[in-house]
Curated annotation (Swiss-Prot):
This is Regulator of microtubule dynamics protein 1. It is found in: Cytoplasm; Cytoplasm, Cytoskeleton, Spindle; Cytoplasm, Cytoskeleton, Spindle pole. TPR repeats lie at residues 168-204, 222-258. Pfam families: RMD1-3 (PF21033). It comes from the Eukaryota. GO terms for molecular function: microtubule binding. The modification N6-succinyllysine is found at residue 165. InterPro entries: RMD1-3_a_helical_rpt, TPR-like_helical_dom_sf. Keywords: Cytoplasm, Cytoskeleton, Microtubule, Repeat, TPR repeat. The gene is RMDN1. One of its GO terms (cellular component) is mitotic spindle pole. Belongs to the RMDN family.
Length: 314
């Protein structure tokens, strides 16, 4: 009704007035005085019937535009609601360890423009690539596919900490297929995106953990890789075990026991720093961590082997 009331103002006459009253008002004075006024009016409006139809069409166009806006807004709301529903399903499948079902769900929306959906698809592609039953050929395809999804997520939303995190992870994975030079060349880019992810969300333990892995990797870099790094950079990437340790501890402070690998790497870093007591403490925690994924099982095995080796040497 409010819309109808607004439209009524555009019509050439109102209720209670005769259709010709707009023109007849000009005849109330002397004919010689009003004639020119009426002529000027006709020169502007043209034929009265045409003018009325024009105004009516304008009013209908206005009504059509408002209807279009309402429908468009409703479509956006519906699309947003659908994306939210997909994300809820995806997060449930991820938490349940349903790796392949999650990938199948999200690949249906691989042309999406939504950054939240795209980085989840990058993660799902990578997770399927890491399954033991995935062939080497399929794994390579999935790794590159994951990088493309992560890149698109970042392009859609540079303020998404998760997009930065998964772009860095996927870029690192691609280095496994492009050689040590490419891996080292991408090192600073990877670090930059991990640091940006932490800046955007200081409470994300995974981003902090990954920054720790970056430090650990360059702290233990073998001599021949250091030579390659010096050829690629004036100041090659480097780090220390102490820096790695600080990130692993920081991740635990943010979210205790969030990830079995963080526990394992705390133990391994303490071994590198020759602190056997604390190394044993964290390796034991890694060994006793409940195994929910294949990776958890592998970490349990590695922690147990390190503890056995550790005890035999003592």
């Amino acid at each position: 009704m409010a819309l109808a009331a607004r439209l009524w103002r555009f019509l050439p006459f109102r209720r209670g007035a005769a259709p010709g009253s707009l023109l007849s008002a000009g005849t109330s004075g002397s004919r010689g005085h009003c004639g020119p006024c009426r002529l000027r009016g006709f020169e502007v409006m043209g034929n009265p019937g045409t003018f009325k139809r024009g105004l009516l069409l304008s009013a209908l166009s206005y009504l059509g535009f408002e209807t279009y806006q309402v429908i468009s807004q409703a479509a956006v709301v519906h699309a947003t609601a659908k994306v939210e529903e997909i994300l809820e399903q995806a997060d449930y499948l991820c938490e349940s360890g349903e790796t392949e079902k999650l990938y199948q769900l999200l690949t249906q929306y691989k042309e999406s423009e939504d950054a939240e959906l795209l980085w989840r698809l990058a993660r799902a592609s990578r997770d399927v690539a890491q399954l033991s039953r995935t062939s080497e050929e399929e794994k390579k395809l999935l790794v590159y596919e994951a990088l493309e999804y992560a890149k698109r997520a970042l392009e859609k939303n540079e303020s998404s900490f998760a997009a930065h995190k998964w772009y860095a992870i996927c870029l690192s994975d691609v280095g496994d297929y492009e050689g040590i030079k490419a891996k080292i060349a991408n090192a600073y880019i990877i670090k930059e995106h991990f640091e940006k992810a932490i800046e955007l969300n200081p409470k994300d333990a995974t981003s902090i953990h990954l920054m720790g892995i970056w430090c650990y990797t360059f702290a233990e870099m073998p001599w021949y890789q250091r030579r390659i790094a010096k050829m690629l950079f004036a100041t090659p990437p480097s780090s220390t075990y102490e820096k790695a340790l600080s990130y692993f501890h920081r991740a635990e402070q943010v979210d205790p026991n969030f990830y079995s690998k963080n526990l394992l790497l705390l133990g391994k870093t303490y071994l590198k720093l020759h602190n056997k007591k604390l190394a044993a403490f964290w390796l034991m925690k890694a060994k006793d961590y409940p195994a929910h994924t294949e990776e958890d099982k592998q970490i349990q095995t590695e922690a147990a082997q390190l503890l056995t080796s550790f005890s035999e040497k003592n």
